[in-house]
Each structure stands twice: as C-alpha cells, then as structure tokens.
Amino acid sequence: MNDYLQTNARYWSGTYNAPNVESFIFRFYGRILKFDYGIDGSGHERLLDFGCGQGAALAFFDNLGFDCFGVDIAANDIAVARSRMPHIASHFAVIDPKPNPEQIFFGGNFDIVISIQTLDFLSNTDFDLAIKCLYNNMKVGSKIYASMNGWAHYYRNHATYVGDGLWHVQFKTDRLDYDLYLNFVRDKEEMAKKFSLFRPVYLDYYDYSFREEGSELRYTFFGVKE
C-alpha cells in the first residue's frame, strides 16, 4: 500500500478524454451557487478545481465569467486543458500526487473550490492533508463542493480492503481494466466527518448506471469555510 499513490498516478497517466461538463457540475452551479447565493460568475469569483483533468468543468465556469484555476497530477490532462483554454493557460498546474497542506495554489484566496471524483483516490491520512490544503487556499466565507465514492459503488465489490480507508480495486471486463486504490464513504454522517473543517450546508449524492454494471454512487458535500 505504501506505493498506492504511484499506482493511482499510473492509472491517470493514460488518456481519458472528458471534453464535456458533467450534469452534477452545471446543476451545482444553477441550483446552489446561483439560486442559493446569487453567484453567477459576473463577479469574476476565483474558482479552483482540485483534480481538474482536461478542464471540462473549468471551461463551463470560465464561459460564465469565473476566474478559473485548475490543478491535477496528470500532466497529459493539464496539457489538454491549457490547449483548450489558451487565454488562461497559466492558470493550470501539475501537482505532486502526495498532498501538501502548506501548498498555496496561484496565491490562494479562492471564493469557490470544487473537487469531483478526485479526493476518493486518497487514503484517510492523505485525504486529511488534501482537505487542509484546500482549507488553507480558501478565504473565509468561500464555498466547497466535493464528492466521494459511496459504499454501494460497485467498484468495492471488486476490491480488497488494505487499510487507512483504502480498497485495492482490481478487475477486468470487456470495457475496463482496473488496478487502483480507492476510498469509499459509508454514509452522509461519515461524509460530514471527513469535511468537518467546513460548515455543512448540503450532504447529498448522485448515482448512475450503464450496461447494468452496477451503482456508481457518490456522496457530495457542499459547505462553507467560516
């Protein structure tokens, strides 16, 4: 398990084309940021995507007027994001797989932080380091929206628990060939504990299933730094 970060980094070093913003991102914008808080991008709020991939979510927010920044461990994905948004190419950075709670991204002081399907690639210990890092990058009153794998996620059916919150997922189908480490959250109560640095506003979830492969349940946390 000691080299789990390298195993996961190898997984992300492959090509994963994801050009479109996901529904759980644009609905978060419309139903929470805009509806609840009147945040629509017109104020050019500073937004960080921790685990931005190829920048699909940031392209959506950039088009709305947000001042967007993204970090990821996958250099190939950061290169795609920079080529996709050359006007903010300097707003993307490759980071080390090992979280550093003292690291400040692009001067910090962010109004909004999102981290979708990223933090669940970390052990409990490294998750805590990453959350402290994000907390330190946010201003008082800023918002965070993040997801974690749910306990019912079908990947866990193909996994062995190895400690510190991590499950070693290994399986191969006609579509997938997985050898990686993931963290799964039992319920909303555990989700709240993991994000206890923030005041919780909404603890929720999203799920989908295709080809009858199984549930891909993820819990979501939306909260505020006080």
Q: Where would I find each of the regions flagged by the language model?
A:
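Helix-capping/helix-break motifs at membrane-protein junctions
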Residues: 123-124
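Conserved beta-strand/loop positions that form the S-adenosyl-L-methionine
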Residues: 50
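Short catalytic micro-motifs in class I SAM-dependent methyltransferases
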Residues: 117-118
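A short glycine-rich, Lys/Arg-flanked "PGG" loop and its adjoining helix->strand segment in the class I
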Residues: 128-140
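Class I (Rossmann-like) S-adenosyl-L-methionine-dependent methyltransferase catalytic domain
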Residues: 1-44, 53-102, 145-226
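A conserved beta-strand element that flanks and buttresses the S-adenosyl-L-methionine
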Residues: 114
